[in-house]
C-alpha cells in the first residue's frame, strides 16, 4: 500500500486511538455482521466496506502492526515490512473476497472465527484455530488464535458453599461477579452437587447478549447429620440400661428436639425411623430421619453403677457370643 493510500483505520472501525483490543474486536464484529457479502448479495459498496474494515482490523488487532501504524502513520508499512505485498495480510492470506466461497462455512459465526483465526495465527494460510473457554457449562468458541483475548461469551460456573441449615431452609446470597453484585435465591432442599441457574449473568458476547451463570452447590459437612438420598442419618448414643429396658429419649432433628421411644432389647447399630423428619424434596415431600443407636458403656462408672453391673454379670443368663462359638474349629 503506497503512502498516498493512507487510511485512518481507527476512523474506518469507528473507534478511538486509545481503544482496547476488546473494544476493537467488538466493533469489528459489529461491522462485519453489517457488511458481510452474504448479508448484502450483489452490493458492491458493502463488499468494499467489508474489505476495508477487515484490512483495518488486521492491522489494529496485531500489537506489533498497530504500534508501527501509530508511530509512523502513512509510512508504517515501510518500517520493516517493505517486502510485503500491498494489501496482504501475511503469508497466504489476502483480503480480496471477490469470488470467495462462503458456502464452506456452516454459519457466519464460523466464518468470522476462521477469519480472525487466520489474522492472528502465525503463517495461518487457512488453518482453523479456536480459543475455547469452558468452565463446565456449554463451551463457547471465541475468535481463533487470540492468546491474550478476553474471556469469550457463554455460560460460566462458580462454586457456592452452604451450611446445612442454609440448604435446608433456603437462603438468599449476595454474589460479587466482579462487574456487578447479584442476589441469588437458593431454594430449600438443595443438596451437594445441586446446580442453580442464574439467567443472563454469564459471559457477555460481542452481540451484547450474556450467557448464564451456573452455581454448583457444596454443603459444608455436618458433625451430626449425613445424607442417604432424601433421608438424614444420625448416630445417637444410648446407655446399656436404656437398650435393655427401653427408654423415651430426646433426638435432635432439623426442626428441633423431638421425643422418640426406644424399644426394650435394641441392638447397637439398629436404626429407628422418624417419619417426615428428613430432607425436603420439592417433588416428593420430606424424607425420613434414621437414628442409628450406639450402645455406649460408661467411661467412668460410679461405685453404685459398678456394683449394679457386677450383680448383673453374676446373674446373667445369656452368653452373647454363643452363636459364633461353632466357628472356633473351622480351620482345625
Swiss-Prot record:
Whether Chaperone counts among this entry's keywords is: yes
Q: Name one GO cellular component term.
A: cytosol
Record's keyword terms, sorted: Chaperone
Cross-referenced SMART domains, in alphabetical order?
A: DnaJ
* Domain J intervals: 6-75
Keyword match Mitochondrion:
no
Q: Which Pfam families match?
A: DnaJ, DnaJ_C
Q: Which InterPro entries match?
A: DnaJ_C, DnaJ_domain, DnaJ_domain_CS, HSP40/DnaJ_pept-bd, J_dom_sf
A single BP term in Gene Ontology = chaperone cofactor-dependent protein refolding
Alphabetically, the GO molecular function entries are:
protein-folding chaperone binding; unfolded protein binding
Which named protein is this?
DnAJ-like protein slr0093
Instruction: Determine the domain of life of the protein's source.
Output: Bacteria
Amino acid at each position: 500500500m503506497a503512502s498516498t493510500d493512507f487510511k485512518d483505520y481507527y476512523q474506518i472501525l469507528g473507534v478511538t486511538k486509545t481503544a482496547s483490543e476488546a473494544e476493537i474486536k467488538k466493533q469489528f464484529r459489529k461491522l462485519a455482521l453489517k457488511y458481510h457479502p452474504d448479508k448484502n448479495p450483489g452490493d458492491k459498496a458493502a463488499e468494499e466496506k467489508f474489505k476495508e474494515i477487515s484490512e483495518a482490523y488486521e492491522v489494529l488487532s496485531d500489537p506489533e502492526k498497530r504500534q508501527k501504524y501509530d508511530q509512523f502513520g502513512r509510512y508504517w508499512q515501510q518500517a520493516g515490512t517493505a517486502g510485503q505485498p500491498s494489501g496482504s495480510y501475511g503469508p497466504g492470506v489476502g483480503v480480496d473476497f471477490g469470488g470467495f466461497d462462503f458456502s464452506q462455512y456452516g454459519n457466519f459465526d464460523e466464518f468470522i472465527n476462521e477469519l480472525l483465526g487466520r489474522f492472528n495465527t502465525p503463517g495461518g494460510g487457512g488453518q482453523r484455530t479456536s480459543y475455547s473457554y469452558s468452565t463446565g457449562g456449554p463451551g463457547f468458541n471465541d475468535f481463533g488464535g487470540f492468546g491474550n483475548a478476553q474471556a469469550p461469551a457463554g455460560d460460566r460456573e462458580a462454586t457456592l458453599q452452604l451450611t446445612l441449615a442454609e440448604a435446608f431452609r433456603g437462603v438468599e446470597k449476595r454474589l460479587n461477579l466482579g462487574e456487578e453484585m447479584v442476589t441469588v435465591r437458593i431454594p430449600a432442599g438443595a443438596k451437594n452437587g445441586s446446580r442453580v441457574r442464574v439467567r443472563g449473568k454469564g459471559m457477555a458476547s460481542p452481540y451484547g447478549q450474556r450467557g448464564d451463570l451456573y452455581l454448583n452447590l457444596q454443603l459444608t459437612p455436618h458433625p451430626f447429620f449425613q445424607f442417604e438420598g432424601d433421608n438424614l442419618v444420625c448416630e445417637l448414643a444410648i446407655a446399656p440400661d436404656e437398650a435393655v429396658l427401653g427408654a423415651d429419649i430426646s433426638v435432635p432433628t432439623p426442626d428441633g428436639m423431638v421425643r422418640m421411644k426406644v424399644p426394650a432389647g435394641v441392638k447397637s447399630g439398629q436404626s429407628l425411623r422418624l417419619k417426615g423428619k428428613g430432607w425436603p424434596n420439592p417433588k416428593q415431600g420430606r424424607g425420613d430421619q434414621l437414628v442409628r443407636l450406639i450402645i455406649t458403656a460408661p467411661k467412668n462408672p460410679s461405685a453404685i453403677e459398678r456394683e449394679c453391673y457386677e450383680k448383673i454379670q453374676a446373674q446373667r443368663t445369656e452368653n452373647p457370643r454363643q452363636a459364633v462359638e461353632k466357628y472356633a474349629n473351622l480351620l482345625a
